[in-house]
């Protein structure tokens, strides 16, 4: 079964310079799981004959049936580099054996939260791109996430077999395709990265450096320029030079790699390289990449697929490929697979690329520490993370929960950043809401067991030092989704993950048999644990709501809930979309509210944000934790706020981080600081449940203009001020032309040219609009990009397929919030219907409350 034991893995875990934590990320159906198979089979876990078909990391039954990856799965591999290859590693190393912790992640945008969880615990990423369809929208999303987490990418061009067999491209066309993909990826990296001066240095990918692989996961072959450079160096060396030492050889190979890509040409007549495209005699020269690398591959494909027996035999002998006796009788595709797999095994090429170019925890934690750790950059925990010190205090981040075979229990899955985690160790378990010095969200408990994750299997292990990925048993009751585990008393939390999608689609669920309600509640708790993205909410009306990223995501969640977590039959409502409330103009009057005892008065106005500010707050560019002056400067420069006002921001809301702002622009009010907390509490309450239909507010700035307070402290307590503040905020919203915002998907559709018309028809029916269409160069495919309201997206995929004969593939990503046109007070408009439906669903009074309820007269 496995070629190496847990003891061997444990021995390597201590050599932290020889660990690689990496995840495989890509657009949906570009072949991540298939490619992972070639790596796994190299480590001897599945038979090489089955690699490419097993999809070992798709552990769930529904993953195998649907042929998609849903959860990210971890697996540890052992790989030994040869003496010659070790010279290519530019960072510190310790022996020739490497431990590679690989996480296969899903490509569907609905599961992109799983990708985020995978990225947090890894330092490098293998970005897989289908060389036929190129860089797609999801490739860009996951790559952007990786770069934001300071994770170093290497690229793999997958599905080369399709380019050769289906599209029948010429070598030069294929080179141009590759060149274009490399450029596209580098554009994304340079747009979102920190440049060469950043802490990571240059992370651009470049075939010359060997950070780009080419191959086919399904057929199990792959190469980087390094493999071919080595063949040619050996070939030229055989012609007369003596044996080279490993270091000189590495130098020669690196020089050779530079000649194999870009505008370098090869003259077959005299075997010389040249930089011009024409030879001295005026003949057009072939590009080196085409002549020396693609040409042999094309020859093998041609000979085998056209059944040229003698030529095939010659080629096999010339390339020195040793076939098994059973492979010799094959012909056509099976023979092609066997030959290519022998000549350019994918496992070796990729594992070499990973070990040589991706950073070890020692290298990576130096520059990732400031992004990971919330506390001061010089306390013990931070120093331990920076130096990846096994003797430092234990700091471990749990990025997700993995369900066990035992119903209702979970493994906590995460990575040790500093220290050593062992069975029976007593630790502090800190949830995401923990603040140092307080007791809430903190538990002191021993760890029952530490385990090693191996795809479908788990192996018990005594202790695990820093830099490794591990599962823990016995902490699942104390954490919901993520958290920090430490032994250091003054430790702060590891930073919470930022998801690129937000849960905007909701369904209400109830048990078919009312007696099963307790099971449903228990099941919902487990569901919330097992998926990083899902939110389970109980409405005031007693409904149980599940919020997810999209239709597919919710479908999987409900299936899990029914079959695994609650084990009862469930009824579900139609999907509902969350809306946001906002304002479109400044309040037309200064709104006044009096406190219940008539002794205190608040005056406020509301006005909309400038464009882009709400998005900046979502991204974390502007936040409550920022340094005051820095934030004021940013707001003044980018959004032309008054600097004095920008410095007097009281808070953000809802939840202290949301996209609404409360500013104090009063002049010389007595006792103002005493009521600040009460006004802030009222503001959090009002922005969480807006005036129109109790949805969150978004993009509203409230200004406190004036406050008159009673001189006696007893008459201006929280009970007087909080409700007053809320009424005043509602009044200022209702006088500022309130509007509803709806979430919008960005849809990317790939299709052949002849069905583009059908797509336009479907989008127009669903209030969508196309903003870009382009042809994928070198293929007959078109890419259409459009905006589509989430509300209209249910059943969109099925509709699209039936109108285009199943030739169009849509991919929906939540993109932005957009104002629903129309006035909610006008009974015939769309927003007023939405408000009425939402209020009815939530069990509120009919109709938007009248302004008189909130506005007082002097």
Curated annotation (Swiss-Prot):
<feature type="site" description="Cleavage">
    <location>
        <begin position="605"/>
        <end position="606"/>
    </location>
</feature>
<dbReference type="GO" id="GO:0042542">
    <property type="term" value="P:response to hydrogen peroxide"/>
</dbReference>
<keyword id="KW-0832">Ubl conjugation</keyword>
<dbReference type="GO" id="GO:0003723">
    <property type="term" value="F:RNA binding"/>
</dbReference>
<dbReference type="GO" id="GO:0003746">
    <property type="term" value="F:translation elongation factor activity"/>
</dbReference>
<dbReference type="InterPro" id="IPR004161">
    <property type="entry name" value="EFTu-like_2"/>
</dbReference>
<dbReference type="GO" id="GO:0034976">
    <property type="term" value="P:response to endoplasmic reticulum stress"/>
</dbReference>
<keyword id="KW-0378">Hydrolase</keyword>
<dbReference type="GO" id="GO:0003924">
    <property type="term" value="F:GTPase activity"/>
</dbReference>
<comment type="similarity">
    <text>Belongs to the TRAFAC class translation factor GTPase superfamily. Classic translation factor GTPase family. EF-G/EF-2 subfamily.</text>
</comment>
<dbReference type="GO" id="GO:0005737">
    <property type="term" value="C:cytoplasm"/>
</dbReference>
<dbReference type="GO" id="GO:0002244">
    <property type="term" value="P:hematopoietic progenitor cell differentiation"/>
</dbReference>
<dbReference type="GO" id="GO:0014009">
    <property type="term" value="P:glial cell proliferation"/>
</dbReference>
<protein>
    <recommendedName>
        <fullName>Elongation factor 2</fullName>
        <ecNumber>3.6.5.-</ecNumber>
    </recommendedName>
</protein>
<feature type="modified residue" description="Phosphothreonine">
    <location>
        <position position="54"/>
    </location>
</feature>
<dbReference type="InterPro" id="IPR005517">
    <property type="entry name" value="Transl_elong_EFG/EF2_IV"/>
</dbReference>
<dbReference type="Pfam" id="PF14492">
    <property type="entry name" value="EFG_III"/>
</dbReference>
<keyword id="KW-0597">Phosphoprotein</keyword>
<dbReference type="InterPro" id="IPR000640">
    <property type="entry name" value="EFG_V-like"/>
</dbReference>
<dbReference type="GO" id="GO:1990904">
    <property type="term" value="C:ribonucleoprotein complex"/>
</dbReference>
<feature type="modified residue" description="Diphthamide">
    <location>
        <position position="715"/>
    </location>
</feature>
<feature type="modified residue" description="N6-succinyllysine">
    <location>
        <position position="152"/>
    </location>
</feature>
<dbReference type="GO" id="GO:0045296">
    <property type="term" value="F:cadherin binding"/>
</dbReference>
<dbReference type="GO" id="GO:0051015">
    <property type="term" value="F:actin filament binding"/>
</dbReference>
<feature type="modified residue" description="N6-acetyllysine">
    <location>
        <position position="275"/>
    </location>
</feature>
<dbReference type="GO" id="GO:0002039">
    <property type="term" value="F:p53 binding"/>
</dbReference>
<dbReference type="GO" id="GO:0002931">
    <property type="term" value="P:response to ischemia"/>
</dbReference>
<dbReference type="InterPro" id="IPR035647">
    <property type="entry name" value="EFG_III/V"/>
</dbReference>
<dbReference type="GO" id="GO:0140242">
    <property type="term" value="P:translation at postsynapse"/>
</dbReference>
<dbReference type="GO" id="GO:0032355">
    <property type="term" value="P:response to estradiol"/>
</dbReference>
<dbReference type="GO" id="GO:2000767">
    <property type="term" value="P:positive regulation of cytoplasmic translation"/>
</dbReference>
<dbReference type="InterPro" id="IPR020568">
    <property type="entry name" value="Ribosomal_Su5_D2-typ_SF"/>
</dbReference>
<dbReference type="GO" id="GO:0034774">
    <property type="term" value="C:secretory granule lumen"/>
</dbReference>
<feature type="modified residue" description="Phosphothreonine; by EEF2K">
    <location>
        <position position="57"/>
    </location>
</feature>
<feature type="modified residue" description="Phosphothreonine">
    <location>
        <position position="59"/>
    </location>
</feature>
<feature type="binding site">
    <location>
        <begin position="158"/>
        <end position="161"/>
    </location>
    <ligand>
        <name>GTP</name>
    </ligand>
</feature>
<dbReference type="InterPro" id="IPR014721">
    <property type="entry name" value="Ribsml_uS5_D2-typ_fold_subgr"/>
</dbReference>
<keyword id="KW-0007">Acetylation</keyword>
<feature type="modified residue" description="N6-acetyllysine; alternate">
    <location>
        <position position="239"/>
    </location>
</feature>
<keyword id="KW-0523">Neurodegeneration</keyword>
<dbReference type="InterPro" id="IPR027417">
    <property type="entry name" value="P-loop_NTPase"/>
</dbReference>
<keyword id="KW-0950">Spinocerebellar ataxia</keyword>
């Amino acid at each position: 079964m496995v070629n190496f034991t847990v003891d061997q893995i444990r021995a390597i875990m201590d050599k932290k310079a020889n660990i690689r934590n990496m995840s495989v990320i890509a657009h949906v159906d570009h072949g991540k799981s298939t490619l992972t198979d070639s790596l796994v089979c190299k480590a001897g876990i599945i038979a090489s004959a089955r690699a490419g078909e097993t999809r070992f990391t798709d552990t769930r039954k529904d993953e195998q049936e649907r042929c998609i990856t849903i959860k990210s799965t971890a697996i540890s591999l052992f790989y030994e580099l040869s003496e010659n290859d070790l010279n290519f590693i530019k960072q510190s190393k310790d022996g020739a054996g490497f431990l590679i912790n690989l996480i296969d992640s899903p490509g569907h945008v609905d599961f992109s939260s799983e990708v985020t969880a995978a990225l947090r615990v890894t330092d490098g990423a293998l970005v897989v791109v289908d060389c036929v369809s190129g860089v797609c929208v999801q490739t860009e999303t996951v790559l952007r996430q990786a770069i934001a987490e300071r994770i170093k990418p290497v690229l793999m061009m997958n599905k080369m077999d399709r380019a050769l067999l289906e599209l029948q491209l010429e070598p030069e066309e294929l080179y141009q395709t590759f060149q274009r993909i490399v450029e596209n990826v580098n554009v994304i990296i340079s747009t979102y990265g920190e440049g060469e001066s950043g802490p990571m240095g240059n992370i651009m990918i470049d075939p010359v450096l060997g950070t780009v692989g080419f191959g086919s996961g399904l057929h199990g072959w792959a190469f980087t320029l390094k493999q071919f450079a080595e063949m040619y160096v050996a070939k030229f060396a055989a012609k007369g030079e003596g044996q080279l030492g490993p270091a000189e050889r590495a130098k020669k190979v690196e020089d050779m790699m530079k000649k194999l890509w870009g505008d370098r040409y090869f003259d077959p007549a005299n075997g010389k390289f040249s930089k011009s495209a024409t030879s001295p005699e005026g003949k057009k020269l072939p590009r080196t990449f085409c002549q020396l690398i693609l040409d042999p591959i094309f020859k093998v494909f041609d000979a085998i697929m056209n059944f040229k027996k003698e030529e095939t035999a010659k080629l096999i002998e010339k390339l020195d490929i040793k076939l098994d006796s059973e492979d010799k009788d094959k012909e056509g595709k099976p023979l092609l697979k066997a030959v290519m797999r022998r000549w350019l095994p994918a496992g070796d090429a990729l594992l070499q690329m990973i070990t040589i170019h991706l950073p070890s925890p020692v290298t990576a934690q130096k520059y990732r520490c400031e992004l990971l750790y919330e506390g001061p950059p010089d306390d013990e925990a931070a120093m331990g993370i920076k130096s990846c010190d096994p003797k430092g205090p234990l700091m471990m981040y749990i990025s997700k929960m993995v369900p066990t075979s035992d119903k209702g229990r979970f493994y906590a899955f995460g990575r040790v950043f500093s220290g050593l985690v062992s069975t029976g160790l007593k630790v502090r378990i800190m949830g995401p809401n923990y603040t140092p010095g307080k007791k809430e969200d903190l538990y002191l408990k021993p760890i029952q067991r530490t385990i090693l994750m191996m795809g479908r299997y788990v192996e018990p292990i005594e202790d695990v030092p820093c830099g490794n990925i591990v599962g823990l048993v016995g902490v699942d009751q104390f954490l919901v989704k993520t958290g920090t585990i430490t032994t250091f008393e003054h430790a702060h939390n590891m930073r919470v993950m930022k998801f690129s999608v937000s849960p905007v689609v909701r369904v209400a669920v109830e048990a078919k048999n009312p007696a099963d309600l307790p099971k449903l509640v228990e099941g919902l708790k487990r569901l919330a644990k097992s998926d990083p993205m899902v939110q389970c909410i109980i409405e005031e009306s007693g409904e149980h709501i599940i919020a997810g990223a999209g239709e597919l995501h919710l479908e999987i969640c409900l299936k899990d809930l029914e079959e695994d977590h609650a084990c009862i039959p469930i009824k579900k409502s139609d999907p509902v979309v969350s809306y946001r409330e906002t304002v479109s103009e400044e309040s037309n009057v200064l709104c006044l509210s009096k406190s219940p005892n008539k002794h205190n008065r608040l005056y406020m106005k509301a006005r909309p944000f400038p464009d882009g500010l709400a998005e900046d707050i979502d991204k974390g560019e502007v936040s409550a934790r920022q340094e005051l002056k820095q934030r004021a400067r940013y707001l003044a420069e980018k959004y032309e706020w008054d600097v004095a006002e920008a410095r007097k921001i009281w808070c953000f809301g809802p939840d202290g981080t949301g996209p609404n702002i409360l500013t104090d622009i009063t002049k010389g009010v007595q006792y103002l600081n005493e009521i600040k907390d009460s006004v802030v509490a009222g503001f959090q309450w009002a922005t969480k449940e807006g005036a129109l239909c109790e949805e969150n507010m978004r993009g509203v700035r409230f200004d406190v203009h004036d406050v008159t307070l009673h001189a006696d402290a007893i008459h201006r307590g929280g009970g007087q001020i909080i409700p007053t503040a809320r009424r005043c905020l509602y009044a200022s919203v209702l006088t500022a032309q309130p509007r509803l915002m709806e979430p919008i998907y960005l849809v990317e559709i790939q299709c052949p040219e002849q069905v583009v018309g059908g797509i336009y028809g479907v989008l127009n029916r669903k209030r969508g609009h196309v903003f870009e269409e382009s042809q994928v160069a070198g293929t007959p495919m078109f890419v259409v990009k459009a905006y589509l309201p989430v509300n209209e997206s249910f059943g969109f995929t099925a509709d699209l397929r039936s109108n285009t004969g199943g030739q169009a593939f849509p991919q929906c990503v939540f993109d932005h919030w957009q104002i629903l046109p129309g006035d909610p007070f006008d009974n015939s408009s769309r927003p007023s219907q939405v408000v009425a439906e939402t209020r009815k669903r939530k069990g509120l009074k009919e109709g938007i409350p009248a302004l008189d309820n909130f506005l007082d007269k002097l």
